């Protein structure tokens, strides 16, 4: 009964004269119905499990040169489902044509049963990163880079099989980043610095699987971020001042919006910060 875009009741919802949802009338209608509850409360369940391994290496090769690197491995598995929480006075709920794949079209559902959707998402992540830093008395500079292999897979436990499958293939992405910076200390108390970077980021999981099933959007673009920062610092024994400005351009962002019972997958958005 709620439009998730506006936070307001959908058209046709039972309302009081004060403009709020009339749950009392809904419960009376549910109790009198011979076809089960028409209005119910449900709980959306999002159960996330993350496992990770992080290993790093650091070596100061000379008085001025330091190298840092490492490996970042992660595995994510997320369960996403909706369960009936309250039948609001009715004896049962009949999903009809919206029954999940493991339910029949004439299923009689009670509190605690699954409705609407039941899916599992997997993300496998393995990345390498490195940073080199060179420091002198008056100045310092660094250069860092990273490369990551990411793979997404969708399990549609509640939906009907597509081409005989309920589990998608893995879809692979290879985002990377590079960033550099320079700092110059022109007196004991004053310094200026500049940083710049370019990053690519794999599209979000729901941009790759926008239809809540195993059919993937093969054209989901990488998000691309370019950023610059310029700053000035002043420090004494008991006072610190930092002034900085930045410019960030973010291209090919993706977002998804629900319109009624349908979803819109919007790609190619650009932003400047």
Show where each model-derived region lies.
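Signature of Gram-negative outer-membrane beta-barrel scaffolds
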Residues: 40, 66-187, 204, 209
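Outer-membrane beta-barrel domain signature, strongest for Gram-negative TonB-dependent receptors
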Residues: 1-77, 82, 238-244
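Surface-exposed loop/turn segments flanking beta-strands in extracellular/periplasmic regions
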Residues: 4, 13-33, 81-114, 162-164, ...
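Surface-exposed extracellular loop regions of Gram-negative outer-membrane beta-barrel proteins
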Residues: 151-160, 170, 183-229, 240, ...
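Short sequence motifs at beta-strands and strand-loop junctions characteristic
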Residues: 41-49, 116-124, 153, 168-175, ...
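Outer-membrane beta-barrel strand-turn architecture
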Residues: 59-63, 134-138, 184-188, 224, ...
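Tryptophan-centric aromatic hotspots in well-structured domains and transmembrane helices
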Residues: 50-51, 81, 117, 125, ...
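Hydrophobic, lipid-facing positions within transmembrane beta-strands of outer-membrane proteins
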Residues: 49-55, 124-130, 147, 176-180, ...
């Amino acid at each position: 009964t709620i439009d998730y875009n506006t936070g307001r009741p959908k058209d046709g919802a039972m309302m009081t004269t004060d403009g709020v949802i009339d749950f009392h009338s809904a419960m009376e209608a549910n109790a009198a119905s011979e076809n089960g509850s028409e209005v119910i409360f449900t709980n959306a369940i999002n159960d996330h499990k993350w496992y990770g391994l992080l290993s790093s290496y650091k070596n100061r090769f000379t008085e001025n040169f330091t190298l840092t690197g490492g490996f970042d491995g992660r595995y994510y598995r997320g369960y996403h489902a909706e369960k009936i929480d309250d039948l609001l006075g009715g004896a049962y709920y009949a999903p009809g044509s919206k029954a999940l794949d493991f339910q029949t079209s004439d299923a009689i559902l009670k509190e605690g049963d699954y409705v609407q959707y039941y899916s599992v998402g997997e993300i496998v992540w393995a990345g390498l990163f490195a940073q080199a830093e060179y420091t002198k008395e008056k100045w310092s500079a660094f250069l860092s880079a990273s490369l990551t292999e990411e793979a997404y897979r969708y399990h549609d436990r509640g939906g009907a099989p597509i081409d005989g499958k309920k589990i998608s293939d893995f879809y692979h992405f290879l985002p990377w980043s590079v960033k550099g910076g320079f700092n110059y200390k022109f007196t004991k108390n004053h310094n200026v610095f500049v940083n710049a970077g370019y990053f690519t980021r794999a599209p979000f999981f729901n941009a790759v699987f926008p239809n809540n099933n195993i059919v993937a959007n093969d054209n989901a673009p990488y998000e691309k971020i370019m950023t610059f920062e310029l700053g000035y610092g002043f420090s004494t024994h008991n006072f610190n001042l930092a002034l900085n400005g930045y410019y960030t351009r973010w291209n090919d962002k993706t977002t998804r919006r629900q319109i009624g019972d349908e979803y819109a997958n919007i790609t190619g958005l650009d932003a400047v910060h």
